[in-house]
Amino acid sequence: MINIDRALRSSIRTGKVVLGSNSSLEHGLRGDAKLIIYASDCPEHVRQKLRSLEVPVYAYQSSGRDLGAACGKPFPVAALAVIEPGDSEIMALLREIRGVANE
């Protein structure tokens, strides 16, 4: 099991991540996003739009405030899109999304 918060910080520092539900939707529609993560308090209509994209989607188990803090930001983040993971392990979440046990 990866440390999601640490992987997020690493991805933001060494890769390319866009914050916010609108930007995440936009990059998901364009096909740029490799992974989308949304907070537990992300509005349901936004979650439905994100899940309808052909991009893996991960439900962060805490609030937007906590997701923002995990990203090193002083504000809530409802959703984010990983465009380039950089040196992080964030893409290991794909195994969880697909239901494959981590080794």
Curated annotation (Swiss-Prot):
- Keyword line: Ribonucleoprotein, Ribosomal protein
| Gene Ontology molecular function | RNA binding; structural constituent of ribosome
Record InterPro entries: Ribosomal_eL30 (IPR000231), Ribosomal_eL30-like (IPR039109), Ribosomal_eL30-like_sf (IPR029064), Ribosomal_eL30_CS (IPR022991), Ribosomal_eL8/eL30/eS12/Gad45 (IPR004038)
UniProt record, GO biological process = translation
Q: What Pfam families would the database entry show?
A: Ribosomal_L7Ae
Q: Which domain of life is it from?
A: Archaea
One GO cellular component assignment for this chain's record is: cytosolic large ribosomal subunit
Gene3D superfamilies, A to Z: 3.30.1330.30
Q: Its family?
A: Belongs to the eukaryotic ribosomal protein eL30 family.
What NCBIfam families does the annotation carry? Answer: PRK01018.1 (NF002172)
Q: What protein name applies here?
A: Large ribosomal subunit protein eL30
- The scientific name of the source species is Methanothrix thermoacetophila (strain DSM 6194 / JCM 14653 / NBRC 101360 / PT)
